[in-house]
Design a protein with these regions (language model features):
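Glycine-rich and polybasic anion-binding loops at the starts of cofactor/ligand-binding domains
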Residues: 1-181
């Protein structure tokens, strides 16, 4: 990120927490998945988990959303051991993510387990009336002798599409600040 010009984005009024879920039709979402490959999917639209397009599991490994794990005492030891342990506390974007993260992916593969399917983490920005600042965080834990293929991707349906309002015109440019531990 340090070579990315962000001043223009930071001068915009950004929406941090989208209040309304944006539903997308299958035709708009299907092209973002690996073609012809069966996979686990964790899909986020505008930073919100979308169970309609996701396929998660707790059989043999945990592939689910981070918020459900953070709220479940069963995962207390794993969370205290790994969550928020690898970020650089002097790095401003890591701190920004820690302050505003609402959701993300959680992948835990126990020792000696190999996932037979890849895991797709798909982030889609649907665009809309204001620019979004998304702060997804993923926690990935692969224990000894475990294997997993993880593909994380980010898409925007209308980057730079001009939005008009009565007061002014602005560009919809999402700012996505992802942290994966």
């Amino acid at each position: 990120w340090k070579y990315t010009p962000i001043r223009k984005v930071l001068n915009e009024e950004l929406t941090i927490f989208k209040k309304k879920r944006h539903l997308l039709e299958f035709d708009k979402v299907k092209d973002f998945f690996l073609g012809g490959i069966e996979s686990y999917k964790i899909v986020f639209i505008d930073g919100m988990y979308d169970p309609l397009w996701s396929s998660t599991t707790h059989e043999g490994a945990d592939i689910c959303i981070l918020s459900s794990v953070l709220e479940n005492k069963k995962y207390g030891n794993v969370i205290s051991k790994y969550y928020n342990k690898l970020i650089n506390e002097k790095e401003s974007f890591s701190l920004l993510n820690s302050s505003f993260t609402k959701e993300g992916a959680f992948i835990h593969v126990p020792k000696n387990v190999e996932l037979e399917k890849p895991v797709e983490i798909v982030h889609i920005n649907s665009g809309g009336e204001s620019s979004l600042m998304l702060q997804p965080r993923s926690l990935v834990i692969l224990e000894k002798n475990s294997k997993a293929q993880i593909i994380e991707s980010h898409y925007s349906l209308n980057v730079n599409e001009k939005i008009h309002s009565d007061k002014h015109s602005t560009y919809v440019d999402p700012l996505t600040n992802t942290v994966t531990e």
